Amino acid sequence: LEQFVATGDSEVPAYLTVFGLRTPDADGRLNEDKTLVEIGCGIGRMTCAFTCEYGTVVACDLDAGFLERCIETVGQFGKVDRLRTSHVIDGHTLDLPPDSADVTFSYITLQHCTPDDALELAAEAVRVVRPGGKVALNFRGPATSDVVVVPAGRLVRSTFRIPTVGDWL
């Protein structure tokens, strides 16, 4: 798990820098004063690093089990006092008020959704971000490797629910 989180620890600063999300706003607000919504947090690979950058991180996922693991992961490797979670029960609606976040972020998540759900989540990302906020969403198209990667991903995710394997991961 530590090595898995370390990949997020190295990627998050790079993405935040590339997307201009590490600089103060025009009003001088720093990230530690802002709220980031992460769509598709999984077990918290990137969430840990986000909690070290932002004052509040709302980790959203379709899988309630992943949200539980995300809390555990951030408890070990991030700042859990900055973490909130939100269950995306229907797969496309964020249970968050409009204009409630400074940044919405999603990476390697939307390709796992149906096209309609991905578009609705993109609209939700815009809905929850404040005027002047930023939306950073990653869309990945299908690839030939998906024949192997998609079933392997399902298998790995299913092992998170097996206590002896899930705890080991």
Predicted regions and their residues:
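Class I (Rossmann-like) S-adenosyl-L-methionine-dependent methyltransferase catalytic domain
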Residues: L1-D33, I43-T93, C113-E120, K134-L169
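Residues that mark the start of a beta-strand
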Residues: K34-T35, R130
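Structural signature of beta-strand start/N-cap positions in the alpha/beta core
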Residues: T35, T56, S100-D102
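Class I SAM-dependent methyltransferase core
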Residues: E38
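A short acidic, Gly/Pro-enriched loop at the edge of an enzyme's catalytic core
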Residues: H92-T104
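A short SAM/SAH-binding and catalytic strip from SAM-dependent methyltransferases
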Residues: V103-D116
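A short glycine-rich, Lys/Arg-flanked "PGG" loop and its adjoining helix->strand segment in the class I
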Residues: L119-P131
